[in-house]
From Swiss-Prot:
Enzyme class name: ligase
Biased composition (Basic and acidic residues): 37-55
Domain of life: Bacteria
EC number(s) per entry: 6.3.2.2
Protein name: Putative glutamate--cysteine ligase 2-2
Organism: Arthrobacter sp. (strain FB24)
Length: 408
């Protein structure tokens, strides 16, 4: 069974107004800045903080000071991963509460605000080169790492799951509001994110050597700062023996996040088996995949998606069910088929995070017609749901971190 782990980006917010707060540095006080893009000399300001892991840490800096990233260790099953997601959220929220703030699993901010880029040389260069794209990039995604035995297997997996990733965007959609505006999208984060030069679906590579040639040519173009800006929907991790899938919004419910990860792991295993059986990847044009991603971002589960077999419109529920059917043999072997169906039906019945945000807005406006009050209520609802059933991290528990992800 392959191990898997996740990274969640969370919004730091004022618990009353809902406004994003530039407090990431404060939340990381006493912890190493362990993100890939952290400065070369991480600060340790309070070595006696009982929530600090003496190795890496479960909280890391991101592009914006209004967000914080949590990371899990590699896990073997849904229950273990769900627990670590909850612990990571609790760790971040506990740190935020020390500064009269909270964290919320929101993929974009419903409240308009001025954002602040995390101060380090790399981000400063990105700000200078990419301008408004960086300024407006307060987006929170959900990244799933799944073990692969080799880069060759990883590229084969990427080639064979690329046509199915838009379904995960629809399932995880959690960003209908953007800076005080109802966007009309279910995952507006996807729209904001896809302004980067390399973001979105990638071509079929065929071999690891071709993958490396493409990456090298992108770097040689001079447009990108470094390999960290290879933002494909699915890519080989630079730091772990994993495929990293990057298409999902951060999910309101921790249970939904763990479900997305389970589906990703099953997709990776299914793709690997196809590769080993000599099944070629579906030759879907990249431009068609971009359209499928756009449709998923726009409609979520409320309308039609592009079926990943025919790429013709089909009811979202049918496309989601087809995805579960596709990975059902792997899920059954891993004793996760029933929980996957339960999780998918829960989202279909209850609605995505975007639908829940809109409902919170409507319920508030029924008693208070001011839009600002409604958006603040959306954030307050998100804080409550994000932390629901989340277990506090005690001094005896290590902060969750993404270590080497392996197969057992």
């Amino acid at each position: 069974m392959r191990t898997f782990g996740v990274e969640e980006e969370l919004l730091i917010v004022d618990p009353v107004t809902g406004e994003p707060l530039a407090l990431a540095d404060a939340l990381l006080t006493g912890r190493k800045l362990a993100a890939d893009d952290a400065p070369d000399k991480p600060r340790i300001l309070d070595p006696h903080d009982p929530t600090r892991d003496d190795g890496d840490t479960g909280l890391t800096a991101e592009l914006k000071l209004e967000q914080i990233e949590t990371q899990t260790r590699p896990c073997l099953n849904y229950e273990e991963l769900l627990l670590q997601i909850r612990q990571g959220r609790a760790l971040a929220d506990t740190a935020a509460e020390k500064h009269n703030a909270r964290v919320a699993a929101l993929a974009t901010s419903p409240i308009a605000s001025t954002t602040h880029t995390t101060p380090n040389p790399r981000y400063a260069t990105m700000q200078e080169r990419f301008g408004l794209t960086v300024h407006e990039q307060l987006t929170c995604g959900f990244h799933v790492h799944t073990f692969v035995e080799s880069p060759e297997e990883g590229v084969a997996v990427i080639d064979r799951l690329r046509d199915k990733l838009a379904v995960l965007t629809a399932l995880s959609a959690n960003s209908p509001y953007w800076n005080g505006v109802e966007t009309g999208f279910e995952s507006y984060r996807t729209q904001a994110w896809n302004r980067w030069p390399t973001s979105g679906p990638s071509q079929i590579f065929g071999t690891h050597s071709m993958y490396r040639r493409v990456v090298t040519r992108l770097l040689d173009s001079g447009v990108l700062l470094d390999e960290g800006m290879i933002y494909f929907d699915a890519r080989l991790s630079r730091n772990h023996p994993t495929v990293e899938v990057r298409v999902a919004d951060v999910c309101l419910q921790a249970e939904d996040a763990a479900l997305i990860a389970v589906l990703v792991r099953a997709l990776v295993e299914s793709a690997s088996r196809e590769w080993r059986a000599g099944v070629d990847p579906a030759p879907v044009p990249t431009v068609l995949l971009r359209m499928a991603a756009w449709q998923a971002s726009n409609c979520g589960l409320r309308g039609d998606l592009l079926d990943f077999g025919t790429f013709r419109p089909a009811p979202a529920e049918e496309v989601v069910e087809a995805l579960v059917d596709y990975v059902a043999p792997v899920l059954a072997e891993q004793d996760e088929l029933e929980l996957a169906w339960e999780g998918v039906r829960r989202i279909l019945d209850r609605g995505t995070g975007s639908e829940q945000q809109r409902l919170a807005m409507q319920e508030c406006l029924a008693g208070n017609p001011e839009a600002a009050a409604g958006l603040a209520a959306v954030v307050a609802h998100a804080v409550d749901v994000s932390m629901r059933r989340t277990e506090a991290v005690t001094a005896r528990e290590k902060a969750p971190v993404l270590l080497r992800v392996r197969q057992s």
